[in-house]
Amino acid sequence: MKKLIYILTISILAISCNTKDNYIQEVYVNEYVNLSLPEYSEIAISGSAIFIEGGVEGIIIYHGVGNDYKVYDRNCSYQPSLSCSVIDSVNSGIAFCGCCTSAFLI
């Protein structure tokens, strides 16, 4: 009887496993951005962000306080498998995904 319960439990667990991968791909990024160029002038102000090519769905460069710059991938980490799952705006240090309405403090 114990063997039957054990086999049923293992079978149910094996059947219920989801094979869908729900993770962000690992992508090597090696970018150099010259912040003194005119196309990046809007990032000179603290609290501003720009979007550039690279990564999985693009790259966000965020200018924090002083000389603090942070870089993030634009792929939303809440539901990364959705095709619309992209950070589309950054306001006051909060990144927003228009697809799943997630907000991330950056």
Residue ranges and their predicted role:
Residues 2-7:
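Sec-dependent signal peptide recognition
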Residues 13-16:
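C-terminal motif of bacterial Sec signal peptides marking the signal peptidase cleavage site
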Residues 18-92, 103-106:
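N-terminal pre-ligand scaffold of iron-sulfur
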Residues 95-97:
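Compact Cys/His-rich metal-coordination microdomains
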